[in-house]
Amino acid sequence: MDLRSRTDDALDMELHAGFDAPEIARAVLTEKTLTGLISSISPLVNRLRDSILIFSDEGLIIHCSLETEQLYIPIPANMFDQYNWTGPRMVVLAATEGRSSLIDAFRHTKDPSTPTRLYFKFTGQPPERSIIQTMVWQRPGDCGPDDQVQCYKQVVKRELACYTMMFPNLTPDISICLKRDQFTRLQRLLKTFGFTTCFILTATDMYIQTAGGGFISFNVSLDINGSKPTPYNLIRSITNSKRILNNVVYGSGSMREFGVLLETHSGFRSAVQNLKLTRDETCYINFYLALTNSPMVGLYIQRSAPVHSFFYATFLSPKDLKEKLTSMQLFANTESVKDEPPLKKRRNLLTKRNEKNTGNKMGGKLPETTWQEGIGIREYCVAPPVDPAGTLDYSELSRESDVICTVK
């Protein structure tokens, strides 16, 4: 529909024509805010099409299940360009019986159909309220390159009258911060190995181990009870301080030696593999240890639309903890690993060896080894490197919809 001559008020009246029920609440996202949310949520859209949307006076929460685990994406009310809410919490299924979903508005596309504005209008009284989502975008017109035509699409859904949901609100006992490069190491580990995931923390180190013998380790500089972080001893590492500093992670909480084993590896693996960090974003691995019978590991991505996920775990027995810790520390301190030449020298040696074997001094391909760039001294993998983590595509699932109205 051509909306080139419409003002905002006229556009608003036309968009909601045909829905005569009085408006009880409204939420609006304009292009600037919506662009940041799309970049954060778009990699997870395939997993969120069948999610649940929860609106309240605090804002919007997108909730879905990832494998057997729970994932939450909160969008607070102050992030919306306009947010007016009255009444109790409202829960809506995002999926419809067709191909449309309320989450489609947060999908990034290469064509001009990426939305520039997003409206949510709420009508009715609980427990029979309705939500009208209006997505507005621009497409090229027929009168030249400067001609832009505004189009819109509407989806109408009714709220769920009966539901049960879990919203963890515990404060983590220990929180460890990973930068993008450190998070990439975790993604690589989980793509290479599988079946189980184990976290072990000591006073100075954190180990993440998977079945098959693969593990990564970080030196922990901890902020205890709000004080300044305890600096990691770098005296012995002055000759290679940059590499060591890249292996230091910062955290907060009351550090103690413990180990936890995730109950389901696939859910944690899927969550990590579906997340991509920019240079300005960080990942927090949170440990909830207050409940001794059911500890949890949390994953928190700090971004425009932060991502929270929680995974149940079990404590390792003192015997298993000691055995795993001893084996990893022994392997980390072996002279064979320490005596490995630096990365640049290793690559030069591989190149010369390849030239000697192939007789090709120009354009010789490096053999696939575990010591290629990105796999260093404190990252032990026994399989060839893999491609960077990507988004897993899953088939779409549909659910029954109350009403769907699409206008173009």
From Swiss-Prot:
Give the location in the cell.
Host nucleus
Descriptive protein name: DNA polymerase processivity factor
Q: Which SUPFAM superfamilies match?
A: DNA clamp
Could you name the Gene Ontology cellular component terms for this entry?
A: host cell nucleus
- Location of the motif Nuclear localization signal: 344-353
Protein family: Belongs to the herpesviridae DNA polymerase processivity factor family.
Q: Which InterPro entries match?
A: DNA_clamp_sf, Herpes_UL42
What does the record give as the function of this protein?
Plays an essential role in viral DNA replication by acting as the polymerase accessory subunit. Associates with the viral polymerase to increase its processivity and forms high-affinity direct interactions with DNA. Facilitates the origin-binding protein loading onto DNA thus increasing its ability to assemble into a functional complex capable of unwinding duplex DNA.
Q: Name one GO molecular function term.
A: DNA binding
Q: What organism is the protein native to?
A: Varicella-zoster virus (strain Oka vaccine) (HHV-3)
Task: Give one Pfam hit by family name.
Answer: Herpes_UL42
Q: Which UniProt keywords apply?
A: DNA replication, DNA-binding, Host nucleus
Q: Give me any GO biological process, just one.
A: DNA replication
Q: How does it assemble?
A: Interacts with the DNA polymerase catalytic subunit. Interacts with the origin-binding protein.
